[in-house]
Regions:
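Extended, solvent-exposed regions of the mature portions of secreted/cell-surface glycoproteins
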Residues: 2-159
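Extracellular ligand-binding interfaces
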Residues: 69-80, 522-622, 629, 637-654
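Short conserved active-site loop signatures built around small residues
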Residues: 91-92, 141-217
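Gly/Ser-rich "nucleophile elbow"/oxyanion-hole loop immediately N-terminal to the catalytic nucleophile
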Residues: 204-218, 264-295, 311
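Short substrate-entry loop that stabilizes the transition state in hydrolases
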Residues: 204-207, 214-219, 224-262, 351-354
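Primarily recognizes the serine-hydrolase "nucleophile elbow" in alpha/beta-hydrolase
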Residues: 278-336
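Active-site-adjacent alpha-helix of alpha/beta-hydrolase-fold enzymes
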Residues: 337-411
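Alpha/beta-hydrolase-fold serine-hydrolase catalytic core, especially in secreted/extracellular enzymes
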Residues: 379-381, 388-531, 541-547
């Protein structure tokens, strides 16, 4: 049985915890293992994974604190959460065979209790009626079903923008002799080695590295590198972020740069600070480092990751964040031996780096070999992430008065920085996997969403475990689009113009991307683009999702103004079974953000991820796709009569 977690074993494991999809339309659910405090936890049983003996049987469903396999063996009793009413209040129903939706129930409204949980379906006395059913309050193998066991079935997690694990922040500053560095342009800068430091403390008022909390033997280190400004105290503009990181168990440092510094010279100053930080904290500072850079600093931290490896600096740089970065000095290809998890954050109303080129889109496109993510934040600007800079980029000529009025608040900017950066560093420096969904675009921290009623964040994401169907790289000709990266034929039906494959910016002057892609337009709901999956590549059952990057094309008359685009992604198997998933039920293909200066509006791609479970869960009167034998992947333009989009990175992925 596909629900048996261990070959030959008797543990029936099935994904149960889920979210309802937008609009409550089929495929109805998106299975997940992470919910924020305040979210609704739904649960369903996929008839495909039910033993025939389970169908049409009464069952009680429990949410219980997670137990390991050994703990379940020692004690298989079930204790439904007290907050849900205990065992007397378990939900009960008759399992259905005809559709996943028929087994869909709200398990926990407004989940309020942070923790790790398992979901257990108890078939009790194996009754076919609720009247005759008696639950036994035990997890009995092989009859009962569990979502959990080896790992938690799901987690309820706090908001990373406000969550803290320590009560106090220690702080001090240091200044050491200046260092002279040479910039990428050949200029020299003499830079005071000055920094602000925050760390977790056990008491208020701690001002020495020796006062670091005794709760842990050592702590990861995060260093922030600011960008260019005439202010000589720019490094102080991230104190709010340092405080939050310290309260989450990091030694957090923001370092000074001189006005006018460029890229590599900023990386050299970072190089000079790291030994000082580790000397101050000794064994309390773990060689487990995250680096964040803003603007020119955002390019500098990518340079630093490369130099650390090439020159043997000796630091374990394990996470890199570029906030509204430049891409103008060394034009990095972040990857290879120095590839590390990477996050880019950038706003649609950046008033300093608002151009089509020289932005984080380019750094993201040229990063490879790591888990990478980019958050494109509608209405965020450049300078409000730094409290010293304030609204400085309002006056650089790239933001109109209407743009300035539309920019989200300084508080929203700070919550974004605290939420996304803390979650990223907690994931990659502390191994806390519960934050992954943020960077796949599955959820936004609640305080971030609540900080502005129109908050929109669109995510690009790429995993290291992928099977690429097409990335559109290589030699481009009029017919090169007809052959995919995976080696299959590509065809179209009904499109009014032949699709064009080329470097995106050569096809669309509004594209911020430095990568190849496909541009296409449709004018009928019967139009399609079809990818043949060659033999030997058709088993995608080991992946979690199918994904692609997509953007509406700026200024295209085919895209309805101020409307999201929509389409269906269809998989077909060797037996001719097909299922089409409507994108708008899982994600959004947004209309390009229109800012006051038309030349700065961007055809910015986001990543659409469709769980492969959506293609094989049981839905009434809809084909189930055999994921071990997928022969065709099709874009079907059946949802909107017209449209023009650019696509890239078609992948089966985790």
């Amino acid at each position: 049985m596909r629900s048996k977690v261990i070959r030959g074993g008797c543990t029936n494991l099935q994904q149960i915890a889920c979210r309802r999809t937008l609009g409550g339309m089929w495929p109805y659910v998106q299975f997940t293992d992470t919910f924020q405090v305040g979210e609704d936890v739904w649960g369903t049983l996929d008839p495909n994974a039910l033993d025939p003996a389970h169908t049409g049987k009464a069952a009680a469903i429990y949410i219980v604190p997670h137990k390991t396999a050994a703990q379940w063996t020692a004690d298989n009793s079930l204790n439904h959460l007290a907050v849900l009413g205990g065992n007397a209040a378990t939900q009960k129903w008759i399992t259905q065979s005809w559709c996943t939706n028929a087994n869909l129930h709200l398990l926990w409204s407004n989940a309020s209790q942070v923790g790790d949980y398992d979901v257990v379906v108890d078939f009790g006395n194996n009754s076919t009626t609720l009247a005759g059913f008696s639950q036994d309050d035990h997890y009995d193998m092989p009859l009962d079903i569990i979502d959990g066991y080896i790992v938690p079935g799901f987690r309820v997690v706090p908001d990373p923008a406000v969550d803290t694990s320590f009560s106090h922040v220690g702080s001090f500053s240091y200044t050491q002799p200046s260092v002279t560095v040479t910039s990428d342009g050949g200029s020299t800068f003499t830079v005071p080695i000055t920094a602000n430091v925050r760390f977790p403390a056990d008491v208020a008022g701690a001002t020495s590295a020796s006062d670091i909390s005794a709760a842990q033997s050592s702590y990861p280190v995060v260093v922030c590198v600011h960008g260019n400004s005439s202010h000589t105290n720019s490094f102080e503009g991230y104190d709010y972020l340092l405080d939050h990181l310290a309260l989450n168990g990091f030694i957090a440092v923001s370092i000074h740069m001189q006005p006018g510094q460029q890229g590599t010279d900023r990386a050299r100053i970072l190089q000079n600070h790291l030994p000082i930080i580790f000397s101050l904290f000794g064994a309390h500072a773990a060689n487990n480092v995250g680096i964040m850079g803003h603007s020119r600093g955002g390019e500098a931290v990518v340079i630093a990751a490369r130099l650390n490896q090439q020159e043997g600096w000796g630091w374990n740089i394990n996470a890199v964040i570029s906030l509204a970065p430049t891409n103008q000095y060394t034009f990095e290809n972040f990857g290879g031996a120095w590839a590390r998890p990477y996050l880019v954050i950038y706003g649609s109303l950046d008033g300093d780096l608002g151009g089509i080129g020289d932005t984080g889109f380019e750094l993201y496109d040229h990063a490879s070999g790591m888990n990478k993510s980019m958050a494109f934040i509608y209405r965020a600007c450049h300078d409000r992430f730094n409290t010293v800079w304030g609204d400085g980029d309002f006056f650089f000529g790239q933001l109109t008065a209407a743009d300035q009025a539309a920019v989200i608040s300084a508080n929203s900017h700070q919550l974004i920085a605290k939420g996304y950066m803390t979650a990223f560093f907690r994931q990659h420096l502390k191994g806390e996997t519960q934050w992954e969904g943020i960077f796949r675009g599955e959820w936004i921290p609640a305080s971030v969403s609540a900080s502005d009623p129109g908050m929109k964040i669109y995510t690009q994401y790429e995993d290291t475990s992928v099977e690429t169907v097409d990335d559109f790289e290589g030699v481009h000709t009029a017919t090169s689009w007809q052959s995919s990266t995976i080696g299959g034929a590509v065809s179209q039906s009904g499109l009014p113009v032949t699709p064009q494959e080329n470097d995106l910016r050569s096809m669309d002057s509004q594209s911020p991307h430095l990568t190849a892609g496909l541009s296409l337009r449709w004018d009928n709901t019967t139009d399609s683009l079809d990818y043949s999956i060659p033999a030997g590549q058709r088993d995608v059952s080991g992946f979690q999702a199918v994904s692609f990057r997509v953007s509406q094309r700026v200024n295209s008359a085919s895209n309805p103004v101020n409307q999201a685009q929509d389409l269906r992604l269809t998989l077909t198997d060797g037996g001719g079974h097909s299922r089409a998933i409507r994108i708008s039920k899982l994600a959004e293909i947004p209309y390009p953000y229109v800012r006051g200066v038309a030349s700065l509006v961007k055809s910015a791609m986001c990543t659409i991820r469709i769980p492969l479970a959506a293609y094989h869960i049981h839905c009434f009167n809809v084909d189930q796709v055999d994921l071990t034998d997928v022969t065709t992947l099709s874009f079907q333009f059946a949802e909107k009569v017209t449209g023009e989009i650019e696509i890239d990175s078609i992948q089966f992925t985790n």
